[in-house]
Design a protein with these regions (language model features):
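Extracellular glycan-modifying ectodomains
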Residues: 1-392
Length: 392
């Protein structure tokens, strides 16, 4: 009995060790009763699931334990709070100017850390450039290309001093020359955005431009095509507060300044097609321009055009004529609604969910203009844009 008392007393001589032991035992117990999550809305990422014993026998010991380690990390109880705590320690205690691969700049702006083209981009960028050139040659005089610079290129003074930045100007200059040589029009929005940098043209916590930034670029396109721009003053602007974007999902800084999404209340119909073959599909589901249910979830930007559908068609407001085809990434989602003032039909293709070439679709619809609208960051890395260059 005396020995047992001495052993118990010796444990309490090390209160820190005891506290840590109890903490990890409690965390382990909490993990056992906490359901696994398939997706982290806050981080906008898929979470690892428990590896099966079949993967142990098929892939070997190392792969099984690697998968198990990632599973434990992704499914730890209170993961969102742990990520936030790590960010707080890094930025407030250690005074780091980056967190989760995101640079923390002035004016509460966040920027991705970019040293240069990664290995895959050195292969993808030339392929996508060649695809643009091919599209311009196949449809001379119809193709307009708009590649949007990153916020860091417009606001270099807000990026932390000495931070790595990709020289986008060098690549955009080369792309401009390539497009024009191939018979297309390069709509260079760099100066336009720089002229309006005192306004809210990029989100602070997200990688997209705002509806205001998109509008200034849209005005420049209208000037190039001889069109009368959409008039915001005759439409009702709606706002959604409390938007935290993709940069925040990675950085999770405690003092992040939330963004505001603005959109115009437009009645235009949008048809999302079921695409099973090249050309114009016959069947689709018709809805409105915006999925306003998304305004009550974390990824509010997904409300524009109901996300990144493979092929959709928007009806104009009745004042415009002709048809335009927009080949795009998500930067175009807040841009496209403005085109309702200029065209009777606006067809929108996103190659992430459209697995065919464009020639049959173009032949079926006889477009008056084609617009390729991407952020440069997406253009240099998109593994699907090569389809624009494929004949057929």
């Amino acid at each position: 009995m005396a020995k047992h008392s001495k052993r118990s007393a010796s444990i309490f001589r090390y209160p820190v060790l005891l506290a840590f032991s109890l903490f990890f035992v409690g965390l382990f117990a909490l993990d056992l009763v906490t359901p696994d999550r398939a997706y982290s809305e806050l981080e906008n990422t898929t979470l690892s699931q428990r590896p099966s014993l079949s993967s142990f026998s098929a892939d070997g010991l190392n792969k099984f334990f690697t998968a198990s380690t990632k599973y434990v990390k992704d499914q730890v109880a209170g993961r969102d709070n742990w990520v936030a705590l790590q960010s707080t320690v890094e930025t407030k205690v250690m005074q780091k100017e980056q967190s989760g691969g995101i640079l923390l700049g002035k004016e509460h702006m966040m920027f991705p850390r970019t040293y240069g083209l990664v290995s895959s981009e050195t292969r993808t960028l030339p392929k996508n450039t060649a695809a643009l050139e091919s599209l311009c040659r196949r449809y001379p005089g119809l193709v307009n290309v708009m590649l949007v610079p990153a916020a860091s290129a417009v606001y270099p003074e807000n990026v932390p001093a000495g931070a790595p930045l990709l020289d986008e100007d060098r690549y955009l200059d080369a792309l401009s020359e390539a497009v024009q040589t191939a018979g297309g029009r390069f709509v260079d929005v760099r100066q336009t955005l720089a002229d309006h940098k005192g306004e809210y043209i990029y989100y602070r916590t997200d990688h997209h431009w705002t509806s205001t930034g998109a509008y200034y670029a849209y005005q420049q396109l209208c000037t190039a095509l001889g069109l009368t721009p959409f008039d915001p003053s005759v439409h009702t602007a709606r706002t959604a507060e409390g938007f935290y974007g993709t940069h925040y999902s990675k950085a999770r800084t405690p003092d992040a300044e939330p963004d505001t999404i603005t959109y115009y209340d437009l009645p235009n119909a949008l048809t999302i097609y079921t695409v099973t073959a090249p050309g114009q599909p016959a069947e689709g589901e018709t809805t409105g321009l915006y999925d306003t249910d998304k305004l009550s979830v974390y990824d509010k930007y997904a409300m524009f055009l109901h996300g990144n559908n493979g092929l959709s068609r928007i009806k104009g407001d009745g004042t415009g004529r002709g048809r335009i085809l927009v080949i795009k990434d998500s930067y175009a989602n807040c841009f496209v609604p403005y085109l309702t003032a200029n065209y009777a039909d606006i067809d929108v293709v996103d190659f992430r969910n459209y697995n065919y070439g464009l020639d049959q679709l173009i032949a079926d619809n006889g477009y008056d203009q084609i617009l390729v609208l991407y952020s440069f960051d997406s253009f240099k890395s998109d593994p699907y844009l090569y389809r624009a260059g494929a004949a057929g």
